[in-house]
Amino acid sequence: MIRKIPSFIEVYKSLIQIPTISSNNKLLDQSNKNFIDLLSNYFSDLNFSVKNYQIPHTDKYNMLACVGSGNGGLLLSGHSDTVDFDEKKWTKDPFKLTETNNKFYGLGAVDMKGFFALILEVISSINIKKINKPIYILATANEETDMSGAKNFIQSTIIKPDCIIIGEPTSLKLINAHKGHMSYSIKVIGDTGHSSNPDHGVNSIEIMHDVIRSLLILKKYFKEEYQHPNFSIPYPTMNLSSIHGGSAINRICPLCILNFEIRPIPGLTLTQIEIVIKEKLETIMKKWSHRIFIKKLFSSVPAYECPHNSGTIKIVEKLCQLNSAAVNYCTEAPFLQRIAPTLILGPGSIEQAHQPDEYLEHYFIQPTKNIITKLINKFCY
């Protein structure tokens, strides 16, 4: 096949140099349109049909590229956005791909713009005219915040591939399950007053003490009632993350705020957790209904699992000579899993993601290309 796009390195450089930061801080959040436009052009040059979809009420976009027709096939998926960064902690330019010591440095180098560069490198070297089933490439928006890109995609798409591979950095280990994530903030409003007469007002810290006691009972309940042997920590976890209250030693505390998170295992739904939280806090909430307020901090992510008896897992395990495993971090898999069996498999280590001087090690390049080629050959030819 005659190459129609720049070299792997040139493509990789061009993807890194476009900022695509997603952040809940509006001052840091950026559109990914320029990145999506560039990626779309690359796939168009390789004879893919490309459609870009704007996420409603945002300046963020998804891209779906396709070559071939019919049912089934393979979907290779990744997110276009990165986290923000602390410039003081970086020793290299985050938006310039730097190759040194057998590593590629740059913001998004491993999480996960390198995966797109590798897909393009493989596609540019194979004869796509002979495929029997479609190859899909999905680039999503806002994975690093609310995952609205993946959520929007599954609501609108009609495609039904045989297999979805998300190229998150797994050190090329095959992942078929991960925990979910829920985060909450509880605010307790008390009374202000002089500490010389502490019974003259309601102390928010004292109410929060009862709230925490109820949450710790819930934490124990999760640990005792729910187990999944494939996880290194085999039960749902709860972490009381931060607590703030009070302003002076001689003042009744008028406000106390507690933030906490829960990481559910597969089999424990977000709805179940919400119901149990309400049950455990019901008594104290009724007693102090006008003083206790609870809200979600961020969009929740369900736990995910592609069952071991799935034919897709068996095919990919045999094809790549890998055994599937479970991890504790979150991806878009629970959403994409709703349209087709989904697995997570990609180059680089998760330990380098979201870190200063983020990098992808060079030795992942050829094995990743080999795996992508095998997947395309298996599901599309």
Curated annotation (Swiss-Prot):
GO terms for biological process: L-arginine biosynthetic process. The keyword Zinc applies. Pathway: Amino-acid biosynthesis; L-arginine biosynthesis; L-ornithine from N(2)-acetyl-L-ornithine (linear): step 1/1. GO terms for cellular component: cytoplasm. It is found in: Cytoplasm. CDD domains: M20_ArgE. One of its GO terms (molecular function) is acetylornithine deacetylase activity. Its EC number is 3.5.1.16. PANTHER family: ACETYLORNITHINE DEACETYLASE. Homodimer. This is Acetylornithine deacetylase. It comes from Buchnera aphidicola subsp. Acyrthosiphon pisum (strain Tuc7).
